[in-house]
């Protein structure tokens, strides 16, 4: 059944992308490129965006099929909720951007509040489905106060899901970069899931891998379509959710190492400039630094993929031990 689901996910995306591209062009849903970004990217202006819709539709359809034939639908329902929730936030953001014809979509506050809401609802659903197990609470020394660990864990879930959702979004700045790294991440978690005996999560990860492979064909340099926030916010949220459902959160630091590095480069760049007036990198996120250092786009993407694969294998080892 897994092989059938993989083929279905791949074919749906593969078929949908060439259908969506002319539709997006006709509706003038093209990407606006930041003027302060690398000048080599200006030629990408107008490239159709919101392509993440294709693999999200593929994932939703294929996961529903998996639910129909599954004895345990709860993991699929949780993952489907996160997929739709974060994907919807990205879709609204993309829609506002293409309508306004600039790179200002939802405000940061609006986006964060929506992401937090999805993360909190995920926690509640996980508790209802009895899929999250935690101790009674944490006692604060020298007091009679005890903080329920569920409160601590919900804060962690919010941080993890929202953080990685935005991390993948920051990484999605070069053709095929975020797509390829996400394929690697889901492949690692698919292997981990089956090794840990969590077949439902493993099957979902396989669906993710093949849905994204169908998209990568059109997203690799020179990209014919971008996934947009519709795709990137969803991917980050899903990857974090998978790590949580496998109780392998720490592994994500390695499996998602490039995403973490990209995010840290932005944080360090902003902090350094505010504190010292100097920049650490030529431009952030990190992939732009290497571009401005003379690397062509394909070299940056290839090296980052290789790094992602190596650290992903380390994360896999950590997750199963």
From Swiss-Prot:
Molecular function terms, GO-annotated: metal ion binding; phospho-N-acetylmuramoyl-pentapeptide-transferase activity
Keyword Zinc recorded: no
Domain of life: Bacteria
Bilayer disposition of the protein: Multi-pass membrane protein
Main location: membrane
Transmembrane residue ranges: 1-21, 49-69, 77-97, 112-132, 140-160, 176-196, 200-220, 225-245, 250-270, 300-320
Listed Pfam families: Glycos_transf_4
One GO CC annotation: plasma membrane
Cofactor(s) it depends on: Mg(2+)
EC number: 2.7.8.13
InterPro entries membership: Glycosyl_transferase_4, PNAcMuramoyl-5peptid_Trfase, PNAcMuramoyl-5peptid_Trfase_CS
Chain's role: Catalyzes the initial step of the lipid cycle reactions in the biosynthesis of the cell wall peptidoglycan: transfers peptidoglycan precursor phospho-MurNAc-pentapeptide from UDP-MurNAc-pentapeptide onto the lipid carrier undecaprenyl phosphate, yielding undecaprenyl-pyrophosphoryl-MurNAc-pentapeptide, known as lipid I.
Protein name in the entry: Phospho-N-acetylmuramoyl-pentapeptide-transferase
